[in-house]
Amino acid sequence: MEILIVGTITVDPERRDAVLAAIRPLVQKTREEEPGCLEYAFTADTVDDGRIVVVEHWQDESTLAAHFVHPNFLATKNRLHERGTGKSVIRKYRVDVSEPVRDSEKRYRADFFTIAEDRS
């Protein structure tokens, strides 16, 4: 089952860009080198200059477990701590269904419409 990780890390607003620049090569390496990595991003919050947003998408639990002991993860974690990032609130979610936000008629849908179509 796919896993999403979503959260935020607090950082001094004056240091946020430097923190992101410091981890950028490691984020890139994670995307390129780690099997099962479907998305991996640390990005500036568009409203709060003191927040970094974390979004990860992993193929399954085993690929996420491998990531947590991979040198890229350990180096990223160390760089974040060395640069004085603050509190983080990061959670993982199991994905049981995935589908587009818009249907075939380009309407935005909050419901999981492909499941409803499969049941009819």
Question: Model-derived features: where do they sit?
Answer:
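Glycine-rich beta-strand-turn "strand-cap" elements at beta-sheet edges
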Residues: 42-50, 76-120
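Residues that form or flank phosphate/diphosphate-binding pockets in enzymes
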Residues: 14, 18, 49, 75
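Intrinsically disordered, low-complexity acidic/polar segments
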Residues: 16-18, 63, 99
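Short, well-ordered beta-strand segments in beta-rich or mixed alpha/beta enzyme
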Residues: 3-10, 41-70
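N-terminal first-folded block
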Residues: 3-42
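Non-catalytic surface loops within mature trypsin-like serine protease
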Residues: 11-13, 60, 94-97
